[in-house]
Protein backbone atom coordinates (compact mmCIF):
# COMPACT_ATOMS: atom_id res chain seq x y z
CA UNK A 1 0.00 0.00 0.00
CA UNK A 2 2.90 2.36 0.78
CA UNK A 3 4.37 1.74 -2.68
CA UNK A 4 1.00 2.39 -4.29
CA UNK A 5 0.62 5.60 -2.28
CA UNK A 6 4.03 6.78 -3.44
CA UNK A 7 3.16 6.05 -7.05
CA UNK A 8 -0.10 7.96 -6.66
CA UNK A 9 1.80 10.98 -5.32
CA UNK A 10 4.14 10.93 -8.29
CA UNK A 11 3.67 13.16 -11.31
CA UNK A 12 1.43 12.15 -14.17
CA UNK A 13 4.43 11.72 -16.54
CA UNK A 14 6.08 9.17 -14.23
CA UNK A 15 3.06 6.83 -14.40
CA UNK A 16 2.62 4.13 -17.01
CA UNK A 17 -0.67 4.07 -18.97
CA UNK A 18 -1.75 1.01 -16.99
CA UNK A 19 -1.02 2.75 -13.69
CA UNK A 20 -2.83 5.92 -14.79
CA UNK A 21 -5.90 3.81 -15.63
CA UNK A 22 -5.67 2.10 -12.24
CA UNK A 23 -5.51 5.47 -10.47
CA UNK A 24 -8.59 6.69 -12.35
CA UNK A 25 -10.55 3.56 -11.45
CA UNK A 26 -9.56 3.78 -7.78
CA UNK A 27 -10.65 7.42 -7.61
CA UNK A 28 -13.93 6.54 -9.34
CA UNK A 29 -14.61 3.76 -6.85
CA UNK A 30 -13.80 6.08 -3.96
CA UNK A 31 -16.15 8.77 -5.27
CA UNK A 32 -18.94 6.25 -5.84
CA UNK A 33 -18.61 4.84 -2.34
CA UNK A 34 -18.54 8.19 -0.62
CA UNK A 35 -21.52 9.56 -2.53
CA UNK A 36 -23.70 6.45 -2.22
CA UNK A 37 -27.00 7.55 -0.63
CA UNK A 38 -28.31 5.97 2.55
CA UNK A 39 -32.04 5.29 2.60
CA UNK A 40 -33.94 6.35 5.70
CA UNK A 41 -35.76 3.78 7.81
CA UNK A 42 -39.55 4.03 7.49
CA UNK A 43 -41.86 3.10 10.36
CA UNK A 44 -45.60 2.65 10.78
CA UNK A 45 -46.89 4.59 13.77
CA UNK A 46 -50.61 3.92 13.36
CA UNK A 47 -52.93 1.81 11.22
CA UNK A 48 -56.70 2.16 11.29
CA UNK A 49 -59.65 1.21 9.14
CA UNK A 50 -63.37 1.59 9.03
CA UNK A 51 -65.57 -1.44 9.50
CA UNK A 52 -66.27 -3.10 6.16
CA UNK A 53 -69.84 -2.68 4.99
CA UNK A 54 -71.77 -5.12 2.84
CA UNK A 55 -72.89 -4.14 -0.65
CA UNK A 56 -75.75 -1.63 -0.29
CA UNK A 57 -75.42 -2.19 3.44
CA UNK A 58 -74.56 -0.23 6.58
CA UNK A 59 -72.00 2.14 5.00
CA UNK A 60 -73.64 2.60 1.60
CA UNK A 61 -74.86 6.13 2.37
CA UNK A 62 -71.26 7.34 2.70
CA UNK A 63 -69.23 8.12 -0.44
CA UNK A 64 -65.76 6.70 -0.95
CA UNK A 65 -64.06 9.97 -0.07
CA UNK A 66 -65.93 10.28 3.23
CA UNK A 67 -64.82 6.78 4.22
CA UNK A 68 -61.27 7.79 3.29
CA UNK A 69 -61.50 10.91 5.44
CA UNK A 70 -62.69 8.89 8.44
CA UNK A 71 -59.84 6.39 8.11
CA UNK A 72 -57.25 9.15 7.68
CA UNK A 73 -58.50 11.15 10.64
CA UNK A 74 -58.58 8.03 12.80
CA UNK A 75 -55.00 7.12 11.86
CA UNK A 76 -53.70 10.60 12.65
CA UNK A 77 -55.52 10.68 15.99
CA UNK A 78 -54.14 7.24 16.89
CA UNK A 79 -50.64 8.43 15.98
CA UNK A 80 -51.07 11.35 18.37
CA UNK A 81 -49.53 13.94 16.07
CA UNK A 82 -50.79 17.32 14.85
CA UNK A 83 -52.40 17.19 11.41
CA UNK A 84 -49.96 19.85 10.28
CA UNK A 85 -47.13 17.32 10.58
CA UNK A 86 -48.56 15.26 7.69
CA UNK A 87 -46.72 16.55 4.62
CA UNK A 88 -48.34 14.44 1.89
CA UNK A 89 -50.91 11.69 1.32
CA UNK A 90 -51.38 8.80 -1.11
CA UNK A 91 -54.70 6.94 -1.25
CA UNK A 92 -55.63 3.96 -3.39
CA UNK A 93 -59.01 4.10 -5.14
CA UNK A 94 -60.10 2.03 -8.12
CA UNK A 95 -63.68 2.83 -9.11
CA UNK A 96 -63.46 6.61 -9.39
CA UNK A 97 -66.37 7.21 -11.78
CA UNK A 98 -68.76 9.78 -10.34
CA UNK A 99 -66.64 10.56 -7.29
CA UNK A 100 -65.66 14.02 -8.47
CA UNK A 101 -62.22 15.46 -9.07
CA UNK A 102 -59.18 14.15 -7.21
CA UNK A 103 -60.70 11.70 -4.71
CA UNK A 104 -57.61 11.66 -2.49
CA UNK A 105 -57.75 15.45 -2.26
CA UNK A 106 -61.36 15.23 -1.10
CA UNK A 107 -60.38 12.69 1.55
CA UNK A 108 -57.45 14.82 2.75
CA UNK A 109 -59.50 17.97 3.17
CA UNK A 110 -62.39 16.02 4.67
CA UNK A 111 -59.99 14.72 7.31
CA UNK A 112 -59.11 18.28 8.26
CA UNK A 113 -55.57 18.34 6.92
CA UNK A 114 -54.14 21.70 5.86
CA UNK A 115 -55.16 23.03 2.44
CA UNK A 116 -51.47 22.94 1.47
CA UNK A 117 -51.23 19.13 1.85
CA UNK A 118 -50.35 17.50 -1.50
CA UNK A 119 -52.13 14.26 -2.33
CA UNK A 120 -52.21 11.61 -5.07
CA UNK A 121 -54.86 9.02 -5.92
CA UNK A 122 -53.37 5.61 -6.81
CA UNK A 123 -55.07 3.04 -9.07
CA UNK A 124 -53.38 -0.37 -9.26
CA UNK A 125 -56.70 -2.19 -9.09
CA UNK A 126 -56.88 -4.42 -5.98
CA UNK A 127 -53.27 -3.59 -5.03
CA UNK A 128 -53.99 0.17 -4.95
CA UNK A 129 -53.96 0.53 -1.16
CA UNK A 130 -50.70 -1.37 -0.80
CA UNK A 131 -49.12 0.50 -3.69
CA UNK A 132 -50.02 3.78 -1.98
CA UNK A 133 -48.07 2.62 1.10
CA UNK A 134 -45.15 1.55 -1.08
CA UNK A 135 -44.98 4.90 -2.87
CA UNK A 136 -45.21 6.82 0.39
CA UNK A 137 -42.43 4.64 1.80
CA UNK A 138 -40.22 5.44 -1.17
CA UNK A 139 -40.77 9.16 -0.67
CA UNK A 140 -39.87 8.84 3.00
CA UNK A 141 -36.86 6.61 2.34
CA UNK A 142 -35.27 9.11 0.00
CA UNK A 143 -35.93 12.03 2.35
CA UNK A 144 -38.44 13.83 0.16
CA UNK A 145 -40.92 13.88 3.06
CA UNK A 146 -40.72 12.79 6.69
CA UNK A 147 -44.39 12.22 7.68
CA UNK A 148 -47.08 10.87 5.35
CA UNK A 149 -50.47 9.17 5.33
CA UNK A 150 -51.20 6.32 2.92
CA UNK A 151 -54.01 3.84 2.46
CA UNK A 152 -56.98 2.93 0.32
CA UNK A 153 -60.71 3.54 0.03
CA UNK A 154 -63.69 2.22 -1.92
CA UNK A 155 -67.47 2.40 -1.84
CA UNK A 156 -68.61 -0.22 -4.30
CA UNK A 157 -72.21 0.50 -3.31
CA UNK A 158 -71.95 3.93 -4.91
CA UNK A 159 -70.35 2.99 -8.23
CA UNK A 160 -72.54 4.23 -11.11
CA UNK A 161 -73.76 2.69 -14.33
CA UNK A 162 -72.60 4.36 -17.55
CA UNK A 163 -73.64 4.60 -21.19
CA UNK A 164 -71.64 5.50 -24.25
CA UNK A 165 -71.77 9.09 -25.45
CA UNK A 166 -73.38 9.75 -28.83
CA UNK A 167 -76.74 9.58 -30.53
CA UNK A 168 -79.35 7.36 -28.94
CA UNK A 169 -79.57 4.14 -30.96
CA UNK A 170 -82.81 2.55 -32.08
CA UNK A 171 -84.04 0.14 -29.44
CA UNK A 172 -82.73 2.09 -26.45
CA UNK A 173 -79.45 2.57 -24.66
CA UNK A 174 -77.24 0.03 -22.92
CA UNK A 175 -76.02 0.71 -19.39
CA UNK A 176 -72.77 -0.81 -18.16
CA UNK A 177 -71.86 -1.44 -14.52
CA UNK A 178 -68.53 0.23 -13.76
CA UNK A 179 -67.86 -2.28 -10.98
CA UNK A 180 -67.64 -4.95 -13.65
CA UNK A 181 -66.20 -2.85 -16.47
CA UNK A 182 -63.42 -1.05 -14.57
CA UNK A 183 -62.90 -3.32 -11.59
CA UNK A 184 -63.61 -6.96 -12.37
CA UNK A 185 -62.99 -7.57 -16.07
CA UNK A 186 -59.76 -8.75 -17.69
CA UNK A 187 -59.60 -6.34 -20.63
CA UNK A 188 -57.08 -8.50 -22.51
CA UNK A 189 -59.04 -11.75 -22.57
CA UNK A 190 -62.46 -10.07 -22.30
CA UNK A 191 -63.47 -12.26 -19.38
CA UNK A 192 -64.41 -11.75 -15.73
CA UNK A 193 -61.67 -12.09 -13.11
CA UNK A 194 -63.51 -15.13 -11.85
CA UNK A 195 -63.02 -16.84 -15.19
CA UNK A 196 -59.29 -16.18 -14.87
CA UNK A 197 -59.41 -17.81 -11.45
CA UNK A 198 -61.19 -20.83 -12.94
CA UNK A 199 -58.30 -21.15 -15.38
CA UNK A 200 -55.83 -21.22 -12.48
CA UNK A 201 -57.94 -23.76 -10.60
CA UNK A 202 -57.77 -26.06 -13.62
CA UNK A 203 -54.00 -25.58 -14.09
CA UNK A 204 -53.18 -26.29 -10.45
CA UNK A 205 -55.88 -28.92 -9.93
CA UNK A 206 -57.56 -27.09 -7.06
CA UNK A 207 -61.04 -28.54 -6.59
CA UNK A 208 -64.26 -26.87 -5.58
CA UNK A 209 -64.47 -28.69 -2.25
CA UNK A 210 -61.02 -27.33 -1.31
CA UNK A 211 -62.21 -23.81 -2.06
CA UNK A 212 -65.46 -24.27 -0.14
CA UNK A 213 -63.56 -25.63 2.86
CA UNK A 214 -61.18 -22.68 2.73
CA UNK A 215 -64.09 -20.20 2.59
CA UNK A 216 -65.80 -21.80 5.59
CA UNK A 217 -62.50 -21.59 7.48
CA UNK A 218 -62.18 -17.90 6.56
CA UNK A 219 -65.63 -17.14 7.99
CA UNK A 220 -64.88 -19.20 11.09
CA UNK A 221 -61.59 -17.40 11.67
CA UNK A 222 -63.13 -13.94 11.18
CA UNK A 223 -65.92 -14.67 13.66
CA UNK A 224 -63.43 -15.99 16.21
CA UNK A 225 -61.16 -12.98 15.70
CA UNK A 226 -63.98 -10.51 16.27
CA UNK A 227 -65.12 -12.36 19.38
CA UNK A 228 -61.55 -12.35 20.72
CA UNK A 229 -61.10 -8.62 20.07
CA UNK A 230 -58.40 -9.14 17.43
CA UNK A 231 -59.60 -6.17 15.38
CA UNK A 232 -60.05 -3.80 18.29
CA UNK A 233 -56.87 -1.81 17.69
CA UNK A 234 -57.48 -1.23 13.99
CA UNK A 235 -61.23 -0.68 13.49
CA UNK A 236 -62.68 2.73 14.27
CA UNK A 237 -66.46 3.32 14.53
CA UNK A 238 -68.29 5.13 11.75
CA UNK A 239 -71.36 7.25 12.40
CA UNK A 240 -73.98 7.22 9.64
CA UNK A 241 -76.46 10.08 9.70
CA UNK A 242 -79.89 9.66 8.12
CA UNK A 243 -82.17 12.68 7.96
CA UNK A 244 -85.08 12.35 10.35
CA UNK A 245 -83.70 9.23 12.01
CA UNK A 246 -81.30 8.55 14.89
CA UNK A 247 -77.62 8.26 13.96
CA UNK A 248 -76.36 4.74 13.41
CA UNK A 249 -72.87 3.85 14.69
CA UNK A 250 -71.23 1.02 12.74
CA UNK A 251 -68.57 -0.71 14.83
CA UNK A 252 -68.06 -4.12 13.22
CA UNK A 253 -67.52 -5.68 9.83
CA UNK A 254 -70.85 -6.64 8.36
CA UNK A 255 -70.04 -9.43 5.92
CA UNK A 256 -68.78 -12.24 8.16
CA UNK A 257 -72.19 -12.54 9.84
CA UNK A 258 -74.01 -13.13 6.55
CA UNK A 259 -73.26 -16.78 5.87
CA UNK A 260 -75.16 -20.05 6.01
CA UNK A 261 -72.62 -22.87 5.98
CA UNK A 262 -75.24 -25.44 4.98
CA UNK A 263 -75.74 -23.67 1.65
CA UNK A 264 -72.05 -23.37 0.71
CA UNK A 265 -71.67 -26.78 -1.01
CA UNK A 266 -75.04 -26.42 -2.75
CA UNK A 267 -74.43 -23.12 -4.55
CA UNK A 268 -74.12 -23.08 -8.32
CA UNK A 269 -70.82 -22.06 -9.85
CA UNK A 270 -70.81 -18.54 -11.25
CA UNK A 271 -68.23 -18.26 -14.01
CA UNK A 272 -68.04 -21.76 -15.46
CA UNK A 273 -71.22 -23.80 -15.52
CA UNK A 274 -69.65 -27.14 -16.45
CA UNK A 275 -67.02 -28.40 -14.01
CA UNK A 276 -66.68 -24.95 -12.46
CA UNK A 277 -65.29 -24.40 -8.97
CA UNK A 278 -65.95 -20.78 -7.98
CA UNK A 279 -69.19 -19.73 -6.28
CA UNK A 280 -70.55 -16.68 -4.52
CA UNK A 281 -69.52 -18.27 -1.21
CA UNK A 282 -65.87 -19.06 -1.94
CA UNK A 283 -65.20 -15.72 -3.65
CA UNK A 284 -64.91 -12.30 -2.03
CA UNK A 285 -67.86 -9.92 -2.00
CA UNK A 286 -68.57 -6.34 -3.08
CA UNK A 287 -68.00 -3.98 -0.16
CA UNK A 288 -67.41 -0.50 1.24
CA UNK A 289 -64.57 0.67 3.48
CA UNK A 290 -61.28 2.52 3.90
CA UNK A 291 -57.94 2.03 5.65
CA UNK A 292 -55.10 4.44 6.41
CA UNK A 293 -51.63 4.28 7.95
CA UNK A 294 -49.41 7.05 9.25
CA UNK A 295 -45.85 6.49 8.04
CA UNK A 296 -42.76 8.46 8.96
CA UNK A 297 -39.01 8.23 9.06
CA UNK A 298 -37.44 6.85 12.23
CA UNK A 299 -35.96 10.30 12.76
CA UNK A 300 -39.37 11.95 12.59
CA UNK A 301 -40.76 9.43 15.07
CA UNK A 302 -38.00 10.36 17.49
CA UNK A 303 -38.57 14.08 16.90
CA UNK A 304 -42.31 13.75 17.52
CA UNK A 305 -41.83 11.37 20.47
CA UNK A 306 -43.96 8.72 18.76
CA UNK A 307 -43.56 4.99 19.44
CA UNK A 308 -43.45 3.06 16.13
CA UNK A 309 -45.53 -0.09 15.76
CA UNK A 310 -43.55 -1.66 12.92
CA UNK A 311 -40.96 -0.92 10.27
CA UNK A 312 -41.18 -1.29 6.51
CA UNK A 313 -38.53 -3.85 5.55
CA UNK A 314 -39.04 -4.42 1.83
CA UNK A 315 -41.62 -4.45 -0.94
CA UNK A 316 -41.93 -5.50 -4.57
CA UNK A 317 -44.27 -5.59 -7.56
CA UNK A 318 -44.50 -8.44 -10.04
CA UNK A 319 -46.41 -9.16 -13.23
CA UNK A 320 -47.42 -12.26 -15.19
CA UNK A 321 -49.85 -13.03 -18.02
CA UNK A 322 -53.14 -11.21 -17.25
CA UNK A 323 -55.12 -14.44 -17.09
CA UNK A 324 -52.69 -15.78 -14.47
CA UNK A 325 -53.18 -12.90 -12.02
CA UNK A 326 -54.06 -15.28 -9.11
CA UNK A 327 -50.45 -16.54 -8.98
CA UNK A 328 -48.74 -13.16 -9.41
CA UNK A 329 -48.24 -12.77 -5.63
CA UNK A 330 -45.95 -15.83 -5.73
CA UNK A 331 -43.47 -13.82 -7.78
CA UNK A 332 -43.75 -10.61 -5.73
CA UNK A 333 -43.26 -12.56 -2.49
CA UNK A 334 -40.26 -14.41 -3.90
CA UNK A 335 -38.66 -11.11 -4.93
CA UNK A 336 -39.11 -9.67 -1.43
CA UNK A 337 -37.62 -12.71 0.30
CA UNK A 338 -34.67 -12.77 -2.09
CA UNK A 339 -34.00 -9.04 -1.64
CA UNK A 340 -33.75 -9.28 2.15
CA UNK A 341 -32.18 -12.73 2.39
CA UNK A 342 -34.99 -14.29 4.41
CA UNK A 343 -36.54 -17.74 4.05
CA UNK A 344 -40.25 -18.44 4.10
CA UNK A 345 -39.73 -20.12 7.48
CA UNK A 346 -38.66 -16.73 8.88
CA UNK A 347 -42.14 -15.29 8.29
CA UNK A 348 -44.42 -15.52 11.34
CA UNK A 349 -47.62 -14.40 9.60
CA UNK A 350 -48.76 -14.19 6.01
CA UNK A 351 -51.60 -12.15 4.56
CA UNK A 352 -52.59 -13.26 1.06
CA UNK A 353 -55.61 -11.29 -0.08
CA UNK A 354 -58.64 -13.49 -0.57
CA UNK A 355 -59.94 -12.14 -3.86
CA UNK A 356 -61.03 -15.74 -4.30
CA UNK A 357 -60.36 -18.71 -2.03
CA UNK A 358 -58.57 -20.10 -5.08
CA UNK A 359 -55.97 -17.30 -4.93
CA UNK A 360 -54.85 -18.19 -1.42
CA UNK A 361 -54.84 -21.93 -2.09
CA UNK A 362 -52.78 -21.41 -5.25
CA UNK A 363 -50.21 -19.26 -3.45
CA UNK A 364 -49.96 -21.64 -0.50
CA UNK A 365 -49.40 -24.50 -2.93
CA UNK A 366 -46.79 -22.76 -5.09
CA UNK A 367 -44.88 -21.10 -2.24
CA UNK A 368 -45.16 -24.21 -0.04
CA UNK A 369 -46.01 -22.20 3.06
CA UNK A 370 -47.77 -23.28 6.23
CA UNK A 371 -51.56 -22.71 5.87
CA UNK A 372 -51.80 -22.20 9.63
CA UNK A 373 -49.76 -19.00 9.27
CA UNK A 374 -51.88 -17.57 6.44
CA UNK A 375 -54.80 -15.18 7.06
CA UNK A 376 -55.13 -16.41 10.62
CA UNK A 377 -57.96 -13.95 11.38
CA UNK A 378 -59.85 -14.44 8.15
CA UNK A 379 -59.69 -12.41 4.97
CA UNK A 380 -61.58 -10.82 2.12
CA UNK A 381 -63.86 -13.81 1.50
CA UNK A 382 -65.43 -13.37 4.94
CA UNK A 383 -64.56 -9.79 5.90
CA UNK A 384 -65.16 -8.22 2.50
CA UNK A 385 -63.08 -6.77 -0.32
CA UNK A 386 -63.50 -3.03 -1.02
CA UNK A 387 -60.99 -3.26 -3.83
CA UNK A 388 -59.10 0.00 -3.32
CA UNK A 389 -58.86 -0.59 0.42
CA UNK A 390 -57.79 -4.22 0.79
CA UNK A 391 -54.05 -3.84 0.15
CA UNK A 392 -53.82 -1.27 2.93
CA UNK A 393 -56.06 -3.32 5.22
CA UNK A 394 -53.83 -6.40 5.19
CA UNK A 395 -50.67 -4.37 5.90
CA UNK A 396 -52.45 -2.59 8.72
CA UNK A 397 -53.72 -5.85 10.17
CA UNK A 398 -50.23 -7.36 10.25
CA UNK A 399 -49.03 -4.22 12.02
CA UNK A 400 -51.32 -5.02 14.95
CA UNK A 401 -51.35 -8.83 14.82
CA UNK A 402 -47.60 -9.53 14.88
CA UNK A 403 -45.60 -9.93 18.07
CA UNK A 404 -42.43 -7.92 18.75
CA UNK A 405 -39.59 -8.89 16.45
CA UNK A 406 -41.75 -11.01 14.14
CA UNK A 407 -41.86 -10.61 10.37
CA UNK A 408 -45.13 -10.44 8.46
CA UNK A 409 -45.53 -10.56 4.69
CA UNK A 410 -48.64 -9.22 2.96
CA UNK A 411 -49.37 -9.84 -0.71
CA UNK A 412 -52.22 -9.02 -3.06
CA UNK A 413 -52.96 -9.80 -6.69
CA UNK A 414 -54.39 -7.24 -9.08
CA UNK A 415 -56.13 -7.22 -12.44
CA UNK A 416 -53.95 -7.23 -15.52
CA UNK A 417 -51.67 -9.94 -14.13
CA UNK A 418 -50.00 -7.93 -11.37
CA UNK A 419 -49.30 -8.21 -7.67
CA UNK A 420 -47.67 -6.32 -4.83
CA UNK A 421 -46.03 -7.62 -1.66
CA UNK A 422 -44.74 -5.91 1.49
CA UNK A 423 -42.63 -7.19 4.37
CA UNK A 424 -42.85 -5.53 7.77
CA UNK A 425 -41.32 -6.24 11.17
CA UNK A 426 -43.09 -5.59 14.44
CA UNK A 427 -41.15 -3.28 16.77
From Swiss-Prot:
The record marks 385 as: Increases nucleophilicity of active site Cys. Keywords: Acetylation, Acyltransferase, Fatty acid metabolism, Lipid metabolism, Metal-binding, Mitochondrion, Potassium, Transferase, Transit peptide. Succinylation at Lys-268, adjacent to a coenzyme A binding site. Desuccinylated by SIRT5. The modification N6-acetyllysine is found at residues 66, 174, 181, 190, 202, 223, 230, 251, 257, 263, 273, 338. CoA binds at residues 219, 258-260, 263, 284. It is found in: Mitochondrion. Activated by potassium ions, but not sodium ions. The active site is at residues 126, 413. Belongs to the thiolase-like superfamily. Thiolase family. This is Acetyl-CoA acetyltransferase, mitochondrial. It comes from Macaca fascicularis (Crab-eating macaque).
